[in-house]
């Protein structure tokens, strides 16, 4: 008789990581999954070993661990459905955690003491786990096939030809230049019109400090990953469609236009020192041309991805204050 191979605890452990990555595959890099995968696999292995040590049956231990993982990772969805969507009191964390814990406890007891056909149950969960992993392949496959990275050398090649003709004439004592982009912040007249909010004090403060405020400006694009590279390169960037494809969903394809932007290169060419201050958004965390890049501590894409993963789980209500402080 062939011994059954049980892998579903591993599959249920890595599925949430692959699922989250597949849903954000066009907005982040593959590097972000390795730390979460390592942590998850370590925890799954530890739980499986402990359960086997306690009940002396690795097959039943696998079932108990998988039930725990399922309840652990569906917690946020259950919470949203019960409390956020339907306003049910027992959807609150203080009650839902107890309910989830109780469900797992009685299920684990039944598996350990009552379940007879362990082989069939393990086979079924193997199939379910494999199906979930396979469900992430279409998104990941599309990303692997259609992703087209743009190198620094390609940036110059695909830009309009007038780039080399731009020159700057500086005064004898050139000023410091601070280019502050308040992404997603309405201009003053629209704030007043739409939200009835008067921000004239803020604008006046900037103007009194010598800043020029573009009072009637408008973004070239409705999304950050398009508007920021467009602003920093002083042009529309529709030509990117010829390189990555007009139907591409790859947000990362525009990042090199930020990291080697035209404004920074022009200013450096006449002697300016270029300092980039990151907002915490991954598109502005790195630069190919800046002399200095200041980034926020713990604000990289790896931390953001891990934070999103934790928010899916039953541990989030317990660590939310710590996680919020870690993200700040």
Protein language model regions, located:
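Alpha-helical transmembrane signal-anchor/signal-peptide segments
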Residues: 144-164, 174
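Transmembrane and membrane-interface helices of multi-pass
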Residues: 1-148
């Amino acid at each position: 008789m062939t011994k059954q191979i049980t892998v579903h605890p591993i599959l249920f452990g890595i599925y949430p990581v692959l699922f989250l990555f597949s849903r954000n595959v066009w907005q982040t890099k593959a590097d972000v999954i390795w730390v979460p995968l390592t942590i998850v696999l370590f925890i799954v292995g530890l739980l499986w070993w402990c359960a086997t040590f306690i009940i002396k049956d690795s097959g039943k231990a696998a079932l108990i661990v998988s039930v725990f993982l399922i309840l652990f990772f569906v917690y946020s969805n259950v919470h949203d459905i019960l409390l956020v969507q339907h306003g049910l009191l027992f959807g609150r964390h203080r009650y839902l955690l107890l309910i989830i814990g109780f469900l797992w406890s009685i299920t684990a007891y039944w598996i350990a003491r009552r379940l007879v056909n362990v082989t069939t149950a393990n086979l079924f969960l193997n199939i379910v786990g494999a199906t979930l992993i396979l469900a992430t392949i279409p998104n990941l496959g599309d990303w692997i096939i259609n992703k087209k990275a743009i190198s620094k050398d390609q940036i110059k090649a695909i830009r309009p030809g007038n780039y080399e003709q731009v020159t700057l004439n500086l005064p004898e004592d050139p000023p410091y230049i601070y280019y502050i982009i308040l992404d997603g912040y309405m201009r003053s007249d629209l704030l007043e019109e739409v939200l009835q909010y008067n921000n004239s004090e803020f604008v006046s403060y900037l103007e009194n400090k010598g800043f020029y405020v573009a009072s009637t400006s408008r973004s070239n694009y409705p999304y950050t990953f398009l508007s920021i590279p467009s602003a920093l390169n002083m042009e529309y960037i529709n030509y990117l469609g010829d390189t990555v494809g007009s139907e591409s969903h790859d947000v990362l394809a525009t990042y090199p236009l930020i990291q080697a932007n035209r404004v920074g290169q022009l200013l450096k060419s006449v002697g300016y020192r270029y300092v980039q201050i990151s907002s915490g958004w991954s598109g502005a965390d790195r630069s190919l041309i800046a002399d200095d890049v200041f980034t926020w501590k713990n604000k990289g894409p790896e931390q953001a991805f891990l934070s999103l993963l934790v928010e899916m789980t039953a541990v989030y209500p317990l660590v939310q204050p710590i996680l919020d402080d870690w993200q700040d």
